[in-house]
């Protein structure tokens, strides 16, 4: 196709020259003139690859790409600023009683009153009523039934108290929290619990003075006999320093601040 086009252009050029020569013969004779005909040549072969040009201008910002997958978890950042103080939490449980403080200074003498004798009498009556109330509770528990061995009497007290409160209760009546030091005593207390329809009670064993060193409530060391359940004692939450007996006769270490029923032990010779 390209060759035909070149050939056609050549013919047209020759025809045009012929017309010029026939129309102006004298002028051509007088003046010699050279005419150059520019005809496009054939397409040449591809040249060598040129050098790398200068970088072009930045193009337009393209559309945002698709959302990629979530990357790996980054490293822990530095601690942020302290936030605002949160709302006040709910009221917690009552804590254990603290140690008794030192006695305070003597107060100023009161104003003499004619009713001082009456007030003294009322105060003494209040003390007596409180003592009678306590003794009535004790008698009520005793009437409900006790358990005996050759040397001991055991009383189940159905008043929920913390460990130290239960210990003081028994001491105030000439006894102590029950101390099962052999299989017979342990079985008797377990039977007592079952017949009362209970699941657990405090007994007189603790490691309050030294963690892991359990002793009886009279501070005598434990010997070879024990009834620890599987995995016990475990001192869960680092606060289990007292011991309970469950209905099966097994022992668990528990927190001293919880409340439950308990068993007092008395020597027969002191009753």
UniProtKB/Swiss-Prot annotation:
GO cellular component terms, semicolon-separated: collagen trimer; extracellular space
Annotated Basic and acidic residues bias: 66-75
Annotated stretches, region: Disordered: 46-113
UniProt KW keywords: Calcium, Coiled coil, Collagen, Developmental protein, Disulfide bond, Immunity, Innate immunity, Lectin, Mannose-binding, Metal-binding, Secreted, Signal
GO biological process: one example: antimicrobial humoral response
Gene Ontology MF terms in the entry: calcium ion binding; calcium-dependent carbohydrate binding; D-mannose binding; DNA binding; fucose binding; oligosaccharide binding
Function noted in UniProt: Lectin that plays a role in innate immunity, apoptosis and embryogenesis. Calcium-dependent lectin that binds self and non-self glycoproteins presenting high mannose oligosaccharides with at least one terminal alpha-1,2-linked mannose epitope. Primarily recognizes the terminal disaccharide of the glycan. Also recognizes a subset of fucosylated glycans and lipopolysaccharides. Plays a role in innate immunity through its ability to bind non-self sugars presented by microorganisms and to activate the complement through the recruitment of MAPS1.
Signal peptide bounds: 1-25
Residues covered by the Collagen-like domain: 56-115
CDD domains reported for this sequence: CLECT_collectin_like (cd03591)
Name of the protein: Collectin-11
Start-end of Low complexity biased regions: 55-64
Assembly: Homotrimer; disulfide-linked. Interacts with MASP1; probably triggers the lectin pathway of complement.
Residue stretches in coiled coil: 116-148
Residues reported in the UniProt entry to bind a carbohydrate: 200, 240, 244, 252-254
Subcellular location(s) per record: Secreted
InterPro entries: C-type_lectin-like, C-type_lectin-like/link_sf, C-type_lectin_CS, Ca-dependent_lectin, Collagen, Collectin_CTLD, CTDL_fold
């Amino acid at each position: 196709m390209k060759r035909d086009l070149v050939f056609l252009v050549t013919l047209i050029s020759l025809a045009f020259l012929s017309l010029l020569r026939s129309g102006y013969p004298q002028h051509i004779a007088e003046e010699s003139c050279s005419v150059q005909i520019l005809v496009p040549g054939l397409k040449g072969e591809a040249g060598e690859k040129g050098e790398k040009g200068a970088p072009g201008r930045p193009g337009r910002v393209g559309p945002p790409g698709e959302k990629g997958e979530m990357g790996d978890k980054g490293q822990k950042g530095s601690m942020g600023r302290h936030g605002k103080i949160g709302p006040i939490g709910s009221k917690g449980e009552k804590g254990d009683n603290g140690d008794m403080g030192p006695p305070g200074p003597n107060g100023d003498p009161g104003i003499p009153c004619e009713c001082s004798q009456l007030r003294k009498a009322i105060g003494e009556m209040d003390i007596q009523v409180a003592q009678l109330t306590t003794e009535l509770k004790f008698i009520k528990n005793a009437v409900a039934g006790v358990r005996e061995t050759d040397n001991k009497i055991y009383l189940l007290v159905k008043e929920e108290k913390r460990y130290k409160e239960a210990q003081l209760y028994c001491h105030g009546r000439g006894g102590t929290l029950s101390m099962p030091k052999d299989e017979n005593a342990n079985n008797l207390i377990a039977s007592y619990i079952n017949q009362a329809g209970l699941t657990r009670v405090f007994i007189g064993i603790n490691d309050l003075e030294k963690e892991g060193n359990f002793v009886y409530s009279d501070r005598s060391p434990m010997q070879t006999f024990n009834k620890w359940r599987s995995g016990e004692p475990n001192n869960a939450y680092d606060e289990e320093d007292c011991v309970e007996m469950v209905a099966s006769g097994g022992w668990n270490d528990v927190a001293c601040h919880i409340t439950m029923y308990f068993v007092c032990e008395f020597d027969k010779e002191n009753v």
